[in-house]
Amino acid sequence: MVCVGIDVAKDKHDCCILDSDGMVRADCFTIPNNMDGFKQLLQTIRNCTKKSDKIKVGLEATGHYSYNILGFLLDNDLAVYVMNPLHTNLYRKSLSLRKTKTDRVDARTIATMLLSDADLKSYTDTAYHNEELKSLTRYRFDKVRERAKLKQSVSRLVTILFPELEKLVPSLHIASVYALLSEYPGAKQISEIHLTKLTNLLTTASKGHYGKEKAIQIREAAKSSIGSVMPAKSLELKHTIKLIKEITSEIDEIEDSIRQIMDELHPPILSIPGVGIQSAAMILAEIGDFSNFESPDKILAYAGCSPSTYQSGKLTNCYAHMEKRGSRYLRYALYNATKYVCHWNPVFSEYLAKKRAEGKHYNVALSHATKKLVRLIYALQKSGKAYLTAA
């Protein structure tokens, strides 16, 4: 067996190759982070190995810096092991009392760790899908938050320019309202529209839901509005609505990509009533390989959903709060999914009602339901069975 340790950096990578006896096949060498460097690494590995040798390549999970070399190694059918930097750091400290940390030392540490740890799992196609899902779901999460902030800006601007409008429609954030405010961003502009033109605009944008009656209501309200006439705010409103439409289009595109991956994976978690594709994708992406977790409690701890513990002498905390450490994305996805599951799944609905009847606050009761959901997800993903079959 031959082990290759790679310390990944932005512009270059340090490498070390050891055999199964810990002897150096290729002392620490540096390659540039480009195709020539990748080919140099591959050629060096081939020069140091025989056809019968089993090759293991290890590198740290260093975010985007490792993506390209990882893809190159996988394309060349090499078994790659992605390691937690915390684990490699602790392992390096265990090898020596000296406080020595260089890229070359790290490369050799990774190679040595490959030799000593037989339980390491190689990077697989499933891991690739998880990385893709993680990138997409986190990107979507950020885009949704960005859109939410813009919607708050729309509400603020409408309060200044045409405050009466909010009482005439179920929501400011619907297609008909956006179409109206994109063309006429203020009470003064709306009050001067010809009724027929306003009716046609609302009818088209609402797909027939609104007609002449709603147009009359809005125009009359605009004529007597207390809204300010501020061209700068009107321009800001138009641009904000335009940005919301663009981001919504981007979110739709992201969700299509997520849906394609989920169609390939077809995970058992989707069989749970109330768990949608987007929530399921984020949960799977953040958890990754379920075999890395010994129990559902480990997943809860990873998500930061476990209660904190504090004890000092005779003092023990009576009202433990959530740790809220770990993956905030996973925590968000689990709580969001739990709300829908409690609505659509009678078992969870009854469980939530039971906890509420015990006098627990809604959020506390929901956290109990989240723990129940995590136990169910863990069981389904480990067994590979659908929810109805498992029940």
Whereabouts are the PLM-identified features?
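A detector of single, family-specific signature residues
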Residues: 1-391
